[in-house]
């Protein structure tokens, strides 16, 4: 399974690199354009994620056997999860000026995925990369090289917070063959 071991978050930097006010403004401006089509964008992200990384589907009993992207696109469960993902990102973006709120939201996401769903933390990093690709392809007029760098910084911070929650709940390192 991706050759990843549980505990992938143990090489975490001490803290996430903070966003400047200008970077927060860039994120909020570009997100406004994305969020107008949040469900469709979220569905595109999840479909590409599952097509390119089919091992991620193991965590979704409702659509883990779907192979066809068109079938995935019609799945109400996939659409529902896409909305949840996009709404979580929206909450982060809307609260960039409130680091405690961002930390709290991402801690809840991380703990749920670690404890309840047992999702390997590396999938957050992978999904972030997929999301950045989809956003830059679907919104090229807004996602310039500079904007992509700012969003990469945000996604790194999201990953840092989520993996912090994994560490907090005692995510243990085990052999990847045991996963």
Curated annotation (Swiss-Prot):
Residues 18-167 form the Globin domain. GO terms for molecular function: heme binding; iron ion binding; nitric oxide dioxygenase activity, heme protein as donor; nitrite reductase activity; oxidoreductase activity; oxygen binding; superoxide dismutase activity. Its EC number is 1.14.12.-, 1.7.-.-, 1.11.1.-, 1.15.1.1. It comes from the Eukaryota. Heme b binds at residues 81, 113. PROSITE patterns: GLOBIN (PS01033). InterPro entries: Globin, Globin-like_sf, Globin/Proto, Globin_lamprey/hagfish. Its main location: cytoplasm. It catalyses: Fe(II)-heme b-[protein] + nitric oxide + O2 = Fe(III)-heme b-[protein] + nitrate; Fe(III)-heme b-[protein] + nitric oxide + H2O = Fe(II)-heme b-[protein] + nitrite + 2 H(+); 2 superoxide + 2 H(+) = H2O2 + O2; H2O2 + AH2 = A + 2 H2O. It is found in: Cytoplasm; Nucleus. Keywords: Cytoplasm, Heme, Iron, Metal-binding, Nucleus, Oxidoreductase. SUPFAM superfamilies: Globin-like. GO terms for biological process: nitric oxide catabolic process; oxygen transport; removal of superoxide radicals. It is an enzyme of class 1 (oxidoreductase). Transmembrane segments: none annotated. It holds the Pfam family Globin. The keyword Nucleus applies. GO terms for cellular component: cytoplasm; nucleus. Belongs to the globin family. Probable multifunctional globin with a hexacoordinated heme iron required for the catalysis of various reactions depending on redox condition of the cell as well as oxygen availability. Has a nitric oxide dioxygenase (NOD) activity and is most probably involved in cell-mediated and oxygen-dependent nitric oxide consumption. Under normoxic conditions functions as a nitric oxide dioxygenase (NOD) but under hypoxic conditions the globin may switch its function to that of a nitrite (NO2) reductase (NiR), generating nitric oxide. PANTHER family: CYTOGLOBIN (PTHR46783), CYTOGLOBIN-1-RELATED (PTHR46783:SF1). Monomeric. This is Cytoglobin-2. The lineage of its organism: Eukaryota, Metazoa, Chordata, Craniata, Vertebrata.
